[in-house]
Swiss-Prot record:
Gene3D superfamilies: 6.10.210.10, VpR/VpX protein, C-terminal domain
Its biological purpose: During virus replication, may deplete host UNG protein, and incude G2-M cell cycle arrest. Acts by targeting specific host proteins for degradation by the 26S proteasome, through association with the cellular CUL4A-DDB1 E3 ligase complex by direct interaction with host VPRPB/DCAF-1. Cell cycle arrest reportedly occurs within hours of infection and is not blocked by antiviral agents, suggesting that it is initiated by the VPR carried into the virion. Additionally, VPR induces apoptosis in a cell cycle dependent manner suggesting that these two effects are mechanistically linked.
Localization annotation: Virion; Host nucleus; Host extracellular space
Record's GO cellular component terms: host cell; host cell nucleus; host extracellular space; virion component
Protein name: Protein Vpr
Pfam families: VPR (PF00522)
Family: Belongs to the HIV-1 VPR protein family.
Keyword Ion transport assigned: yes
Quaternary structure and interacting proteins, as annotated: Homooligomer, may form homodimer. Interacts with p6-gag region of the Pr55 Gag precursor protein through a (Leu-X-X)4 motif near the C-terminus of the P6gag protein. Interacts with host UNG. May interact with host RAD23A/HHR23A. Interacts with host VPRBP/DCAF1, leading to hijack the CUL4A-RBX1-DDB1-DCAF1/VPRBP complex, mediating ubiquitination of host proteins such as TERT and ZGPAT and arrest of the cell cycle in G2 phase.
Gene: vpr
Anything else known: HIV-1 lineages are divided in three main groups, M (for Major), O (for Outlier), and N (for New, or Non-M, Non-O). The vast majority of strains found worldwide belong to the group M. Group O seems to be endemic to and largely confined to Cameroon and neighboring countries in West Central Africa, where these viruses represent a small minority of HIV-1 strains. The group N is represented by a limited number of isolates from Cameroonian persons. The group M is further subdivided in 9 clades or subtypes (A to D, F to H, J and K).
Length: 96
């Protein structure tokens, strides 16, 4: 009969502590890139939708991650990460 392996990995941080630390890091990064009033409105929407629950914490983490990813991908002026617009040359053969 199979047995579950013993827990041999390193001690893990409890999920709720990890989630709150992640949320704090995301909030600190978000205020550098988005208007505070806009972020406050987002927080109010999450609170009105989920209340003071872990589901709300997970939702705002997910939304902030997506917003920051898209913001950096489009090309944040404060970051070296992102798409750099290039001029296309019309004289060469087209790629298809």
């Amino acid at each position: 009969m199979e047995q579950a392996p013993e827990d041999q990995g390193p001690q893990r941080e409890p999920y709720n502590e990890w989630a709150l630390e992640l949320l704090e890091e995301l909030k600190n990064e978000a205020v550098r890139h988005f208007p505070r009033l806009w972020l406050h409105g987002l927080g109010q929407h999450i609170y009105n939708t989920y209340g003071d629950t872990w589901e709300g914490v997970e939702a705002i983490i997910r939304i902030l991650q997506q917003l920051l990813f898209i913001h950096f991908r489009i090309g944040c002026q404060h970051s070296r990460i992102g798409i750099t617009p290039r001029r296309r040359v019309r004289d060469g053969p087209g790629r298809s």
